[in-house]
Amino acid sequence: MKILKTQTLRGPNYWSIRRQKLIQMRLDLEDVAEKPSNLIPGFYEGLVKILPSLVEHFCSRDHRGGFLERVQEGTYMGHIVEHIALELQELAGMPVGFGRTRETSTPGIYNVVFEYVYEEAGRYAGRVAVRLCNSIITTGAYGLDELAQDLSDLKDLRANSALGPSTETIIKEAEARQIPWMLLSARAMVQLGYGANQQRIQATLSNKTGILGVELACDKEGTKTTLAEAGIPVPRGTVIYYADELADAIADVGGYPIVLKPLDGNHGRGITIDINSQQEAEEAYDLASAASKTRSVIVERYYKGNDHRVLVINGKLVAVSERIPAHVTGNGSSTIEELIQETNEHPDRGDGHDNVLTRISIDRTSLGVLKRQGFEMDTVLKKGEVAYLRATANLSTGGIAIDRTDEIHPQNIWIAERVAKIIGLDIAGIDVVTPDITKPLTEVDGVIVEVNAAPGFRMHVAPSQGLPRNVAAPVIDMLFPDNHPSRIPILAVTGTNGKTTTTRLLAHIYRQTGKVVGYTSTDGIYLGDYMVEKGDNTGPVSAGVILRDPTVEVAVLECARGGILRSGLAFESCDVGVVLNVAEDHLGLGDIDTIEQMAKVKGVIAESVNADGYAVLNADDPLVAQMAKNVKGKIAYFSMSKDNPIIIDHLRRNGMAAVYENGYLSIFEGEWTLRIEKAENIPVTMKAMAPFMIANALAASLAAFVHGIDIELIRQGVRSFNPGANQTPGRMNLFDMKDFSVLIDYAHNPAGYLAVGSFVKNWKGDRLGVIGGPGDRRDEDLMLLGKIASQIFDHIIIKEDDDNRGRDRGTVADLIAKGIVAENPNASYDDILDETEAIETGLKKVDKGGLVVIFPESVTGSIEMIEKYHLSSE
């Protein structure tokens, strides 16, 4: 077997609306394409031996062992690869469960789809699954050492991809409140919400965190001075820069015991406490100086007591933890080294921030701490005897936490909240040393030793003893107070034809409200009046530009087939989803071979509408109308006829619809009617001569109306939207030349040709078409373009795209010509493959009063060419 292609889906997609994080592998089964597992000698035995945990997979049997039963009875390798990829991730600590395997129209080629937690780990699991299967097929086995290495690699990928525990805690709380989030590339920053309603976090820093507060908190001596000036109890201390200043500094703080720590340190690095001799002080100075970027060392009076972390969020105390340094307790027989190994094997401990607790590491600092207690690594501790491995109680160095939130004295709460405000932090971790947190600091000689920006949440969320505290909730409350919205309205538009016009018209209607509208289309990404990026921008990457922009108040997103298949949607749900039509275009691409499969692709938009939103569906297109059964939100239809049975039934049920009736675009709900405007007064309809543009206007108007836009603003929007080259390039752009007219439209499929033809057929003069088609379409589709063109035009010029998408020069034109002749053997046509030359010929050949219709590859180039021709002919 070999992998032909791997892609990552990150939003609602063809395979699942709810399970949005999926790996899709295109797999060639090669020699085993016709061999189910029961026909491969030793395969079942080899698979069970290396992965016995597959017994937990139910598969379609709905009971434990169901999948292995299918392997024993005979199933194909694509299905087996799917289950192995899932199981490998499970074994590496990433819980997943969803998978699908489907054969494509090419025999032996399968799409294998499976869930992932972390993208790189998921892709790697897919590669390992194929390698494992190939090994069992050819040798009957897969090495245990190889599997161990694979799982180790997967765990490394998981660790490298995982967010920190504090960030993860905040994200889980956001998800519980249906707040969308996305990871920004800049320094592991996370965006919560969309557009103008977004907030950002980085670990436990937020976009509300003041830089002055962070700077002050990082300046430990400055923090202490500021707090002392405010009457807060802090340790006596001073800063030194050279070792020969140490003796004077010790005297200044009142002598031993003392604490030495780096001026700009963190996570307890370089700190030594309870120093009682000159030798200890000199050794501690070397440690602290080495841990400081500026070689600056704080010398402080040591205060006896327990180490506490007090967490203040948005001015309110939310949690208190007593922190105990990394330590081991003797059992009377084991050495300290053995006790450390035993402690590190506890399931709650992991490397770094991988788990609730961090494994205890042995280094110069820990050996020094042991030495000061009179211990070595080979010391056997008495039963119950405690050996500390760190002087500081940070969880990151192996410490543990005990929740003391309910025990802290009210005066200490007041002091902590005051400290956070004095330093200027919205989220502050305040380190308190006191013999008794239940008594006021001032009564027991307690002190504030540090204030930390970006404090860790792990000790509060998962203490070793005591109640876990949901400290993420007050963070979300602060970022989104009083249920402030995190989302912006998202209106998504899809279909085979008309997407760009409908998207731009809908965005134009929304701009009448005065809101900042961001939209994506086949011509570019737009924010308000300005284009951000030119080009075909109808995929999730482009949509992400809009959703990340902090100025955008409304997002209108054109969603094309390619992006949905390639990556899924950029959003997990939308407020309004518009499906215009489904026609035979792009068939044979991306394993979408039938129009029913294409309808499933387009239906992703309708199925992604949230429960309070609306799916706006074309009642005149049976494939679109059928999507209603899978919509979890509300449904509104549009139609070119009030007599459409779906419309009649929908209105009978008090549903909402937009209909073209008696020359008007009207909205119906139950028995009442609201007329938007007469079609001939809406420029995009070409004086009501372009039925497909009327349908687009109906869809856009209805989408705006169901989302609460006032009818007068909708009317104002459709009246002022002019389908010119500037407003809608390549969409029914009509140019009046001196003696004839030119129409440019980006129609490139049979349905598009028919739509433009409904307008062209009403033209009174000569009708000349400059036509072509994309090279990646099926032969029958290109021939159909020729057949339709012969019904529309008096004369045809066939040209080809510069990019024929894999076809030889001239083959596209030959197929179109075959279609023309098949429809009308006497049809008048020429082959002029170069687009520019073909257009120039058409402009010279058309009769006075005639119409030249251009279906271009380059919309911009064609428009510029016509505008120059117009100027030169005046």
Swiss-Prot record:
Enzyme class: ligase
Record field: temperature dependence: Optimum temperature is 50 degrees Celsius.
Keyword match Ligase: yes
Pfam family, one: Mur_ligase_M
Documented EC number(s): 6.3.2.29, 6.3.2.30
pH-activity dependence text: Optimum pH is 8.2.
Protein family membership: In the C-terminal section; belongs to the MurCDEF family.
Protein name in the entry: Cyanophycin synthetase
Species of provenance: Geminocystis herdmanii (strain PCC 6308) (Synechocystis sp. (strain PCC 6308))
Lineage of the species this protein comes from: Bacteria, Bacillati, Cyanobacteriota, Cyanophyceae, Oscillatoriophycideae
Gene: cphA
